[in-house]
Curated annotation (Swiss-Prot):
One of its GO terms (molecular function) is mRNA 5'-diphosphatase activity. PROSITE patterns: NUDIX, NUDIX_BOX. The gene is rppH. It comes from the Bacteria. Its cofactor is a divalent metal cation. GO terms for biological process: mRNA catabolic process. This is RNA pyrophosphohydrolase. A motif (Nudix box) lies at residues 46-67. Accelerates the degradation of transcripts by removing pyrophosphate from the 5'-end of triphosphorylated RNA, leading to a more labile monophosphorylated state that can stimulate subsequent ribonuclease cleavage. It comes from Rickettsia bellii (strain OSU 85-389).
Length: 161
């Protein structure tokens, strides 16, 4: 259970984007975070730079995290989704200025090949990657993001089938 202290509840959410990137087989790109010893898998995500639109941020983050921008946006989430990070992580992330993230999510069709993906980017976030089914995605995801992922899957599921 994610316990968030009253002090941390007063902090704002960091604005960001998340990307559900689909290959031709409707499998979803997931990466294993490089900065933790536990097996923490997630879809690519990142912050929005001031003055940047969420859709521009999504395509920039895709390039930064998977080393390719070969793809196009199928859909944008109808709302902002948010999650809180566990209290012990707050001081370690974003200089302790945010309690979690509020994100606009994008369903993106990847048009490249596996060879186009390069997670050894300038600032790598993943040390492994793979394509996962919807069911796999929800079972391997880091627990404090699971509720958000369930909501994103529910919103985009009809477009994936």
């Amino acid at each position: 259970m994610n316990k968030t202290s009253k002090k941390h509840l007063a902090l704002p959410y960091r604005p960001g984007v998340g990307m559900m990137i689909l290959n031709a087989d409707n499998k979803i790109f997931v990466g294993k975070r490089i900065d933790t010893k536990i097996s923490a898998w997630q879809m690519p995500q990142g912050g929005i730079v001031p003055g940047e639109t969420p859709s521009i941020a999504a395509m920039r983050e895709m390039l930064e995290e998977i080393g390719s921008s070969k793809g196009y946006i199928i859909a944008e989430s109808k709302c902002w989704y948010s999650y809180d990070v566990p209290s012990f992580l707050i001081p370690k992330l974003w200089d302790g200025n945010f309690r979690g993230q509020k994100q606009r999510w994008f369903l993106i069709r990847f048009t490249g090949t596996n060879e186009d993906i390069n997670i050894n980017t300038l600032n790598p976030e993943f040390d492994e990657w793979r394509w996962a089914s919807l069911d796999e995605l929800l079972s391997i995801i880091i627990p404090f993001k699971r509720k958000l992922y369930q909501a994103v899957v529910k919103e985009f599921e009809s477009l994936i089938q």
